[in-house]
Every structure is written in structure tokens, then in C-alpha cells.
Amino acid sequence: PFRTGEEGTPALPLVHDMETKFFEQLLIDCDREFQELIKKLQISQSAIPTILDYYESHDADSLTKKIKSIKSFCGIYAPLTKVENGYIPDYTSRYFTEDIPYGLILIKSYAVKYNVSTPKIDSIILWAQENMGKKYLIDGELNGENIDETIAKYIIE
């Protein structure tokens, strides 16, 4: 249900239970893009290791297993809202209202500034902005009508 948010999920899932190979592979792909940016910024990989290194994993399956084994992630509910046919993502939760404009947009801003390609990160921004009713990224450029609500204006000039 988190992929589209249109169909309700019947129960309120824990974030821990939503960890799947699909999401972990997307996380790995985004991390690869982020690591390319880290190289351009000349930051040591030892300062910011890859997600696979950090979680002592080697692929999406092992990362999924590792994250599901972390006790501190248990008991955290996904940011969802109750609707008639179950639950849908709550696009007003801080997972969206903070993590997109001050997280992914921050990374994307530096990627633009340092000419690093971010197709997977872009796909998440596009998905989120559509569901949040915001416009940050238009045709690969951070020039949407809501971009001034983000940190991008301080990075890209």
C-alpha cells in the first residue's frame, strides 16, 4: 500500500513489518547515488559508510534480514491514516513533511550542484511530492513552486 497509497491496507502495520526486498533495494540504490555525492564532496567513506557496510550486509535480502532483527525498530508504526477501507500513508507526517524537503531535497540540491545523477532519489521525490500535493522537482530540476519551502535555495544559487 505504501507504493501508491490508493488502496487501504487492512491493519496498521509496523515499519519493521514493511521492510521488504523491494524497499531495501531502493534504499541501496539511493545510497549508491548518495555515495557518489560523498566522493564528489571528498568526504571519506569511513566517515559515512555505505548502508550495506553500516548494517554488515551484502545485498537487499541480507539488509532486509538485518534491519528486521534490530529490536529498536520493532514497535514503530508506519505513518498511516485510517480511511474507510483500511489505512493509507499519512502524507502530513514528519516522515514526509521533514524528510523530503530537508532530507532528500538537501541531498538532491548538492547532487545538482556537484553534477551527480540521482534517478532513484528523484523517483522518491517525485512520488512523495505527488502524494503530498507539493512541487519541488520538475523535469529533473529543483524549480517547482514549493522549492522555497526547502533548504535547496541555500545550496543552489
Residue ranges and their predicted role:
Residues 2-17, 21-157:
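NAD(P)-dependent Rossmann-like dehydrogenase/reductase catalytic/cofactor-binding core
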